[in-house]
Amino acid sequence: MKRIGILTSGGDAPGMNAAIRAVTRTALANGIEVCGIRYGYAGLVAGDIFQMTSETVADKINRGGTFLYSARFPEFKEEEVQLKGIEQLKKHGIDALVVIGGDGSYHGALKLTRHGYNAVGLPGSIDNDIPYTDFTIGFDTACNTAMEAIDKIRDTATSHQRVFVVNVMGRDCGDIAMHVGVATGADAIVIPEEPYDIKEIAENLKQGFANGKKHGIVVLAEGVMDANKFKDELLKYGDFDARANILGHMQRGGSPTTRDRVLASEMGAYAVKLLLEGKGGLAVGIENNKLSHHDILDLFDAKHHGNYALYSLNKDLAK
């Protein structure tokens, strides 16, 4: 193996740049050249590929987003399009690939491995929704961003004795909502994985005000319901003032936390180690605080298991 490529795909996540840096410098330290591929699989097919050096990744570890840029490119599911990507890999002398992203990115990595190009996937997703890893790159930063926003929302909620329904990211996974809900002392957490009773939530909020509380916070994962609709449903059972707030894409931005920078660096170096061993079609993770890897194919049949003890804990603490 003389040269590897690296790309970021799908939704961006803080810490991706730290992973790119680790992959690049670990490979270079082992005598392997590195090519950056801009705009994910779309850039691969278009041949938007350039040589990277240690200087290329300097001063990037602290930056959010991905300096290689990203793009959603569902066309890569098609065999004909994959072969165009393979042509570009051959043209640029790339022997293996590191892909940073989520589920769709992993599908692309598996396709390339089946075409004879070893590819290793790193879990880059703020949702923390990828199986066989306790944490994904970007999750911790997203949680801290959401926590800081909700802390500020609590200030104005208290001033006006209001309830705020705060929508956080997590289409199919409630991990951000659970972690942030506990961290901000939310009155209720609503996630896709657990049933909820909106009347019960309203009653608990009313009881809180009756007991002297000056605010109410409901943390709602985006995959459950639109925040404004949830707020309107809540008001059918409560005589309090309520507002909805959608945090949205701010959760994807910002300088990555220490935890995300370290995790991304460890995973990036580990991915290169696997490629040096001639391995491909693998997904890197961290389980019980140890780096691990699994066949990408296994991930598609598995389901991420969140720490649902946090959901139960918050119910107890919110009483």
Swiss-Prot record:
Mg(2+) binds at D103. Its EC number is 2.7.1.11. One of its GO terms (biological process) is fructose 6-phosphate metabolic process. Homotetramer. Allosterically activated by ADP and other diphosphonucleosides, and allosterically inhibited by phosphoenolpyruvate. It comes from Lactobacillus gasseri (strain ATCC 33323 / DSM 20243 / BCRC 14619 / CIP 102991 / JCM 1131 / KCTC 3163 / NCIMB 11718 / NCTC 13722 / AM63). This is ATP-dependent 6-phosphofructokinase. It is an enzyme of class 2 (transferase). It comes from the Bacteria. Belongs to the phosphofructokinase type A (PFKA) family. ATP-dependent PFK group I subfamily. Prokaryotic clade 'B1' sub-subfamily. HAMAP family: Phosphofructokinase_I_B1 (MF_00339). Pathway: Carbohydrate degradation; glycolysis; D-glyceraldehyde 3-phosphate and glycerone phosphate from D-glucose: step 3/4. GO terms for molecular function: 6-phosphofructokinase activity; AMP binding; ATP binding; fructose-6-phosphate binding; identical protein binding; metal ion binding; monosaccharide binding. Its cofactor is Mg(2+). The lineage of its organism: Bacteria, Bacillati, Bacillota, Bacilli, Lactobacillales. It is found in: Cytoplasm. It catalyses: beta-D-fructose 6-phosphate + ATP = beta-D-fructose 1,6-bisphosphate + ADP + H(+). The active site is at D127. ATP binds at G11, R72, F73, G102, D103, G104, S105. ADP binds at R21, A22, V23, T24, R25, R154, G185, A186, D187, K213, K214, H215. Substrate binds at S125, I126, D127, R162, M169, G170, R171, E222, R243, H249, M250, Q251, R252. Pfam families: PFK (PF00365).
